[in-house]
Amino acid sequence: MSIHMAQNAFARCAEKVNTRKNLTLNRQAVGEVVSYCTMIAANDTLDFNRDKQERLCTEMNHRAEVYTVEMSAYGQPKAREKLRERTAPMLDKPFVLPAGQYPRKQREKDALAERRAAGDLVIRFFIEALDSMGYDRAQINSTVEEARKNYEQFLEWAKDGE
């Protein structure tokens, strides 16, 4: 193997590691933004006060912990399936995180898939939290739609550099 081939192989491996690291950071950042969008949506549509905001946050964290335990017990695919089974009956239509720009390259498509997976998890924790707080299907759906709109607004601000 020539030195040039070895350097190229090393560069490809380093790029893969950086891509995985970036996807993980991307997933975490989107999860945080979607969490903020849900909190704002709950405040706007359900007229939350500080106590309800704190309870919602606690309930969402609890649902995330339940999911983590299920992942450890059953593996990620089965844990996701169980989460979808619990939350799907409460949704009128599937939640799909807005894309912003259409992805052209494979790494952009991978990043969008990661963002959508993170957004899906947060929204499902949000749905379970609202359900446990006694909100009905119509209230949950209107609040989820408001959270989606909030995320679209965030994308506009990000595009404008605000």
Label every PLM stretch briefly:
Residues 1-41, 66-126, 153-162:
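Intrinsic disorder/low-complexity detector
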Residues 56-67, 143-152:
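Amphipathic alpha-helical segments that form the core helices of the histone-fold
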Residues 41-42, 46, 128-129, 133:
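Extracellular/lumenal glycan-associated surfaces
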